[in-house]
UniProtKB/Swiss-Prot annotation:
It holds the Pfam family RuvB_C. The RuvA-RuvB-RuvC complex processes Holliday junction (HJ) DNA during genetic recombination and DNA repair, while the RuvA-RuvB complex plays an important role in the rescue of blocked DNA replication forks via replication fork reversal (RFR). RuvA specifically binds to HJ cruciform DNA, conferring on it an open structure. The RuvB hexamer acts as an ATP-dependent pump, pulling dsDNA into and through the RuvAB complex. RuvB forms 2 homohexamers on either side of HJ DNA bound by 1 or 2 RuvA tetramers; 4 subunits per hexamer contact DNA at a time. Residues 183-253 are annotated as: Small ATPAse domain (RuvB-S). It comes from Heliobacterium modesticaldum (strain ATCC 51547 / Ice1). Residues 256-370 are annotated as: Head domain (RuvB-H). This is Holliday junction branch migration complex subunit RuvB. It is an enzyme of class 3 (hydrolase). InterPro entries: AAA+_ATPase, AAA_lid_4, DNA_helicase_Holl-junc_RuvB, P-loop_NTPase, RuvB-like_N, RuvB_C, WH-like_DNA-bd_sf, WH_DNA-bd_sf. Belongs to the RuvB family.
């Protein structure tokens, strides 16, 4: 389990308040406007025809609201929601037990659907397409197949790795949507709404400071709000102002772009130890004491989103924007690549003043504010 404050993966303490903070309807749901518009039309059409909604696949980074949307879909349809996950369905019989206990029009939510094993997935195909189960009874020459009719239902699948879904499974979803990262103004609304529910007085400036550091992810925004609330309660008058939020986040070691100490250590190692790269991910991970999986799945995606790190065929490379953010000199080899000149073999001590490349850094930097 990832214990970092800034991870978008679910942590145990998130479960305590996530349920109370979740919106119940599409009207309350903030962000993902295109997805909301489409779902509103599809749900109203299904209700008008008195048919189940087509199966829905939601994919995208963790913490963006896939589970919440599944709950909202069931609420808007006025039916029950049954929740499970790919790893929890180990055998075809487990899936059969779930499907045969559904009521007509129910919504079945399978989180991490990409982790279904192949035998279970093959049982799911006819259930999604024909609302039936094909079960083999017996073995050898005495084996026979029987078909069990199922109530018509809607499957909502969620995954952070859509590329791992097999084509037959993906093709059986009628509605497929990617969830995008949230803008700071959307996160600010989410934080102010959560503050009201939690009984916290938060000023817009304080909410904005938290939003800018939340990596475009509501789960992280709510987590930071709870920690800033603690600082406001103990060190101030209980009000989350801009000043209180900045001081609390400084103590939590979250910088203005949402980088924590793990992100900063990786960038500093890449720039100082390996002259900006390229360097293999195994070597880079070992240099900061992290596993390769943690670097690839947890640390790198946000750094690439900001334009601070590139994955290349030769290895990982820092960018001039990363050097400017950390306030460190730009290695000469990295600067040569930026300018399109042949780069000499990089040296950890061969660098160029960050002042001299300020214009390039400003052009390369990406900001959520834009």
């Amino acid at each position: 389990m990832d214990e970092r404050m800034m991870t978008s993966a679910k942590r145990p303490e998130d479960r305590e308040t996530e349920w109370s903070l979740r919106p119940r309807t599409l009207r309350e749901y903030i962000g993902q406007d295109k997805l909301k518009e489409n779902l509103t039309v599809f749900i109203q059409a299904a209700l008008g025809r008195r048919e189940p909604l087509d199966h829905v696949l939601l994919y995208g980074p963790p913490g963006l609201g896939k589970t919440t949307l599944a709950q909202i879909i069931a609420q808007e349809l006025g039916v029950q929601l049954r929740v499970t996950s790919g790893p929890a369905i180990e055998r075809p019989g487990d899936l059969a037990a779930i499907l045969t206990n559904l009521q007509p029009m129910d919504v079945l939510f399978i989180d991490e659907i990409h982790r279904l094993n192949r035998a279970v997935e093959e049982v799911l195909y006819p259930a999604m397409e024909d609302f039936c189960l094909d079960i083999v009874i017996g073995k050898g020459p005495a084996a026979r197949s029987i078909r069990i009719d199922l109530p018509r239902f809607t499957l909502v699948g969620a995954t952070t790795r859509a590329g791992m879904l097999t084509s037959p499974l993906r093709d059986r979803f009628g509605v497929i949507h990617r969830l995008e990262y949230y803008r700071p103004d959307e996160l600010e609304f989410i934080i102010l709404r959560a503050a009201t529910i939690l009984g916290v007085t938060a000023e817009p400036e304080g909410a904005r400071e938290i939003a800018l550091r939340s990596r475009g992810t509501p789960r992280i925004a709510n987590r930071l709000l709870k920690r800033v609330r603690d600082y406001a309660q103990v060190l101030s008058d209980g009000v989350v102002t801009g000043e209180v939020a900045r001081e609390a986040l400084r103590r939590l070691e979250v910088d203005p772009r949402g980088l924590d100490t793990t992100d900063q250590r990786l960038l500093e190692a890449l720039i100082r130890k390996f002259a900006g790269g390229p360097v293999g991910v195994e070597t880079l991970a070992a240099s900061v004491g992290e596993s390769v999986d943690t670097v690839e799945d947890v640390v790198e995606p946000y750094l690439m989103q900001l334009g601070f790190l590139n994955r290349t065929p030769r290895g990982r490379m820092a960018t001039i924007a990363a050097c400017a953010h950390l306030g460190v000199p730009v290695p000469a080899g990295l600067l040569a690549l930026q300018e399109g000149r042949p780069a000499l073999l990089p040296s950890a001590t061969d660098d160029t003043s960050s002042t001299a490349v300020g214009a390039a850094a400003e052009q390369a930097a990406l900001s959520f504010d834009e």
